[in-house]
């Protein structure tokens, strides 16, 4: 009886202590640092903060911000509206496993890396509105297994691939540059077959091509080839055995990027690179030719001269050796007579009648008379 009485007396007290403990565990700690002109996330905030509002500052979410943010692991809500964020880096929120709401609207985000949302297993609401996002890899959202709301309003997105097992309840897509060609077929099929609600459906319009600008992305008609190019449904069996995403999986993300690149137009950077390479090669070839041509010309000219000298020498030797008897037929004469005859051979006298008189003939006649 005494034990029962003691138990009855302490039971209300134990319940009160337990309720206080539960309430303390769910206690919200809010910190508001809006419009403070901060360039970095403060490192002296209470470590038990659960709701942190850093909107309207100059924060960029660089490496220092990421390290400081990891220390606030009890965060359930994080607001970074209208800051200077341009890139969402891998593992930028990796230690915030309790985060449920992330609002990064009205920044200048144009790159979201593959593992930007790693670790956010409990995230339910993601706001990326009014940024400069042009394309999103579908695998970026794979770690967000609890995501229910996605706001992509007011970006530069023209198409969006939706991953399997993406069980959203509300999505906002208006204010983008939607290209309602075949590349949008998968998104349209998902919007029409899933339980997701497209917010502001009537103003989520096509931007391209011009003939489809009067249609919203959920009801735009597609041609028959779009149905054959893109399967109408994707089975979820491929992802049944999907394990929690880790860093090693995202290190091999190049395969996924290759798959998505089939629907993406090639940028102008490749054409520019090819042009630069061709220009460099052509210029190098011209310089090489300009340097080597004079040398090659001199070598060729020298070779021709050498061949010409060899040919003349061979001709002279052939002529000299071909008529050896000619020298023996020459009669032996006095050197003086030879000299006189040589000189007389070239002595010509113009006669009175205009004819040239050769004195060699005269001398020969005189010799006969004598």
Swiss-Prot record:
Identify the SMART domains for this entry.
LRR_TYP, LRRCT
Q: Which residues lie on this side of the membrane: Extracellular?
A: 25-270
Q: In this protein, which residues make up the domain named LRRCT?
A: 176-227
Give the Gene3D superfamilies listed for this entry: Ribonuclease Inhibitor
Q: Which UniProt keywords apply?
A: Glycoprotein, Leucine-rich repeat, Membrane, Repeat, Signal, Transmembrane, Transmembrane helix
Q: Does the keyword Hydrolase apply?
A: no
Look up the record and report any one GO term of the cellular component aspect: plasma membrane
Query: Which parts of the chain span the membrane according to its record?
Result: 271-291
Q: For this entry, list what GO says about its biological process.
A: host-mediated regulation of intestinal microbiota composition; positive regulation of canonical NF-kappaB signal transduction; positive regulation of non-canonical NF-kappaB signal transduction; regulation of cytokine production; regulation of inflammatory response; toll-like receptor signaling pathway
Summarize what activates or inhibits it.
Activated by TLR ligands such as LPS, bacterial DNA and peptidoglycan.
Q: Which residues are glycosylated?
A: 32, 37, 62, 95, 179, 192, 195, 202, 251, 256
Please tell me in which tissues this protein is expressed.
Expressed in renal collecting duct epithelial cells.
Coiled coil regions, renumbered to chain = none
Q: How does it sit in the membrane?
A: Single-pass type I membrane protein
- The LRR repeats lie at 46-71, 72-95, 96-119, 120-143, 145-168
Please give the residue ranges for the topological domain Cytoplasmic.
292-370
- In terms of domain of life, where is this protein from? Eukaryota
Primary role: Pathogen-recognition receptor which mediates the activation of TRAF2- and TRAF6 NF-kappa-B signaling pathways and induces the expression of pro-inflammatory cytokines. In kidney, prevents infection by uropathogenic bacteria by inducing the production of cytokines, chemokines and antimicrobial substances. In gut, involved in host-microbiota interactions, plays a critical role in promoting the recruitment of immune cells and intestinal inflammation.
Protein name stated in the entry = Leucine-rich repeat-containing protein 19
Organism this protein belongs to: Homo sapiens
| Gene giving rise to this polypeptide | LRRC19
